[in-house]
């Protein structure tokens, strides 16, 4: 799969760092696009060229980790605070693959992980009020990121739409129907989930 690919999309996290090492060990002459400073650093150390996302005409495949993924490949990417840029690369890619261990796979996304909103700083107060109307308890992570905690989520698609329609919201950490596959590492080996 990797041999025919020139430009990779790479997210952030420890798993992606291991993937970078694999790419280098496999002797692949590739370029990468990534929003992660840590991944950029690892790529630089390994001699993998990182190009600006705007300079990537085509991304065949992008790999990323996540906080939680359900059986329909919906995922939360709430931890790193770079979900907007990760989602741009995911949408650019012809195939978006999540790399996770078995502990991150759930039947349905639950409310243990917050939905994080990237917001225009001047809209943080307004967005907070609108999110509260949708049933969220809101915690400000910083001036651009709001963490939304819900007691329950009945309809992921509707929640995703409702949050994106709030003026001042740039993007959400809910990756609804974005991933095409997940590579899951477990005690019994590797399995592939796909939509």
Model-inferred region functions:
Residues 1-64:
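N-terminal active-site beta-alpha-beta segment that forms phosphate/nucleotide-binding
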Residues 38-195:
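Conserved phosphate- and dinucleotide-binding cores of soluble alpha/beta proteins
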């Amino acid at each position: 799969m990797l041999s025919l690919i020139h430009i990779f999309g790479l997210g952030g996290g420890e798993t992606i760092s291991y993937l970078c090492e694999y790419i280098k060990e496999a002797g692949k002459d590739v370029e990468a696009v990534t929003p992660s400073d840590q991944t950029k650093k690892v790529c630089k150390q390994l001699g993998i060229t990182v190009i600006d996302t705007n300079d990537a005409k085509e991304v065949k495949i992008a790999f990323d980790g996540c906080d939680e993924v359900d059986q329909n490949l919906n995922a939360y990417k709430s931890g790193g605070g770079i979900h907007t840029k990760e989602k741009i690369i995911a949408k650019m890619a012809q195939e978006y693959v999540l790399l996770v261990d078995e502990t991150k796979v759930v039947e349905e996304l639950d409310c243990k992980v917050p939905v994080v909103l990237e917001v225009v700083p001047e809209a943080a107060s307004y967005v907070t009020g609108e999110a509260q109307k949708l049933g969220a308890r809101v915690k400000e992570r910083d001036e651009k990121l709001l963490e939304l905690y819900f007691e329950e989520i009945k309809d992921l698609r509707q929640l995703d739409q409702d949050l994106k329609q709030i003026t001042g919201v740039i993007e959400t950490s809910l990756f609804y129907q974005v991933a095409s596959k997940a590579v899951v590492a477990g005690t019994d080996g590797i399995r592939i989930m796909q939509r």
